Amino acid sequence: MLENKSVKEIISLIKTKEASIKEVVVFYLERIKKYNPSLNAIVSIKEEEQIINEAKHKDEKFDESKPLFGLPLASKDLLDVVGFPTTCGFPGYKDYFPKKNSIIVDRQIDAGGIMIGKTNTAELGVGAHTANRLFGITPNVYGNTQSSGGSSGGAGVAVAAELLPFADGTDMMGSCRTPAAYANVYGFRPTPGLLPDYRTNDKKKNLPIISTPGCLARTPDDMAILLDVIAGEHKEDPISFSLTNSFKDTNIRDQEFSKIKIGWLSDMNGNYQYDPELVEMCNKQLDSLEKNKIIIEYLKPKI
């Protein structure tokens, strides 16, 4: 009943009582038990009994005002979740248990989500492939001899395999976008500050601001539901900001396409070598976008 359903559809089933929260949680837990041993996407997880008890409690204390009410969630193992170690995939951090949640983790829990575990990451969040000495490799969801990308490969694979409805991540140089592309899902690296993080008020120590929380989802509509929960200003992030509109209610009208600008790096001014067929495919798509009045800015950074 729940397989291939969008998050919006699952939320609707919960609200109309066509599916209990326990049923939704069990659906995802069964998929985790079946597929995660080979995918290694979720690397820390609560005891099943504890998760199901949380689901039963939410069924009893139903609150449809909370947008993620009853959805099982897992955060990237670079983000802090109380009760789980934040290991970053690094053996030296295997016993580090945070005393408070990351901001976007708190927001998911406050919105009714059930935090069940942590998703795998490249070691210390650095790398184009998701592998580390603590938990090992997360392979591609479509074949275990291919890469899942990095560093949010656990999240990308978990979302693609329907082990999670959607997932948070972090992105510095493609860490949400690359795993999403490799898993045929959507990945988003927002403007730094849209998704808040605990940062120092010393602006000199924040520059350059490269890394930011991000997210992954199977559809843009699913992602909008998560973004509406985790985006927005926070007093402990000096660069954070809020938007006036809801992501769910935002549509780009035809007349607004001419205002969209895309920066294209290509081979980074000759510093990176890519497969010529890949570059040709991208250039064809850029030509198509330009014909639709989208502005393409061809960038040649000095590296």
Show which residues each predicted segment covers:
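Short, well-ordered beta-strand elements within core beta-sheets of diverse protein domains
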Residues: 10-16, 74, 92-96, 211-218
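Enzymes and membrane/adaptor proteins characterized by extended Gly/Ser/Thr/Asp/Glu-rich
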Residues: 35, 67-104
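A short helix-breaking turn/cap at a secondary-structure junction
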Residues: 189-280
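Flexible, glycine/charged-enriched surface loops at secondary-structure junctions
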Residues: 68, 235-241, 290-302
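An N-terminal boundary/leader segment
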Residues: 1-46, 50-53, 291-293
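Short glycine/serine-rich loop segments
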Residues: 101-230
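Acyltransferase
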Residues: 21-25, 56, 248, 274-301
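Flexible, acidic active-site loops/lids enriched in D/E/S/T/G that coordinate Mg2+ and/or position polar
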Residues: 48-68, 75, 94, 98, ...
